[in-house]
Amino acid sequence: MNSAPSFDDRKRVVERGYDKVAHDYARLEGETAWPRMRWLKKMLNQLEPGSSILDLGCGSGDPADIEVAKEHKVTGVDISQTQINLARQNVPTGNFIHGDAGSVEFPVASFDAVISFYTLEHIPREEHETILRRIHQWLRPDGFLLISLEAGEVDSIISEWLGVPMHFSCFDPETVKWLVNRVGFEIVETEIESQVEQGDAIPYLWLLARKQ
């Protein structure tokens, strides 16, 4: 019997996949930008100009980090070097780091907000609580967390996503909200919204929280 893929195996699938589909995914980001930008602006309206914002799983930086960089300092992390290269082109004022969201390090109280769109769903869900705790540490008092991820329980590598294998790993929305509360956040607002990707309507959980 074949053993289940290791954490590292699953992460390599994500890294290779996003390296290969970077330009196709950038187009998809443009087609599905509206919920991301609506939630992002909702959070940005509560921050002072010049705030420090971390985008965990930043992709190409378009459109979110382009918007953030208009008035704020942006740091982005992505497991795909190709995506990081695109982000550096799209947002020249940003600081973009090639790294794994599960192991990257920042000093305590480094950021006023952390955003992570469509990223946790690619990280083994066994790591989600640990990553949320680390985000809580990186945030300054009253800092914001804004995340989105697929609103369904899944843990598998699918054979075809934009033409490549891809790993998805999510808890159900109630468990995600429980974890966010458990690590020390107060949830400000949540919503499940569907968006069409490759002809399919996929529900996503959007969650805005604040560090207690």
Regions found by a protein language model. Name each.
Residues E129-P141:
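A short glycine-rich, Lys/Arg-flanked "PGG" loop and its adjoining helix->strand segment in the class I
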Residues E150-H167:
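Short, glycine-/aromatic-enriched active-site segment of Class I SAM-dependent methyltransferases
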Residues V196-Q212:
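Core SAM-dependent methyltransferase catalytic element
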Residues F168-V183:
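Short alpha-helix
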Residues I115:
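A conserved beta-strand element that flanks and buttresses the S-adenosyl-L-methionine
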